[in-house]
């Protein structure tokens, strides 16, 4: 995974990218992984959310107009029923009721951002189904 990630960073660098922006908040192991990948690819890096309040971060993301769809859930924490749902404040409350972190920072869930103020057009996801694999529920999309 690391090699493939760095390969994609090198491709982005060839296209003119100079900096990698990461969304990690406060897990040092993740921060170091981010730094290592960027450094190995010869790119600068920024972690603008680093040391932010997790719940505040996710609320600011939603308030800013970003739309993210839950793409993967850890079935130890959350049910596959969360797959395909768009992150909003009521859903954050549902997520917290499962005992999961509001941001999913501990790997409870992962999202795919499909729209927001930086997008010229939203990304349309064609949902093909759901897969259960190795303790995770995964939304299959095209």
Question: Where on the chain are the PLM-derived regions?
Answer:
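Nucleotide-activated chemistry modules centered on ATP-dependent adenylation/adenylyltransferase
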Residues: 1-142
């Amino acid at each position: 995974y690391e090699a493939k990630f760095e390969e994609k960073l090198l491709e982005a660098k060839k296209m003119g990218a100079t900096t990698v922006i990461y969304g990690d908040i406060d897990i040092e192991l993740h921060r170091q992984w981010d730094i290592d990948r960027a450094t190995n690819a010869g790119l600068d890096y920024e972690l603008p959310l680093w040391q932010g309040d997790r719940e505040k971060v996710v609320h600011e993301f939603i308030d800013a107009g970003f739309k993210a769809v839950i793409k993967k859930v850890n079935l130890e924490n959350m049910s596959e029923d969360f797959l395909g749902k768009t992150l909003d404040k009521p859903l954050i409350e549902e997520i917290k009721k499962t005992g999961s972190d509001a941001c999913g920072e501990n790997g409870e869930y992962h999202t795919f951002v499909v729209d927001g103020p930086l997008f010229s057009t939203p990304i349309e996801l064609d949902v093909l189904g759901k897969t259960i694999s190795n303790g995770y529920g995964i939304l299959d999309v095209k």
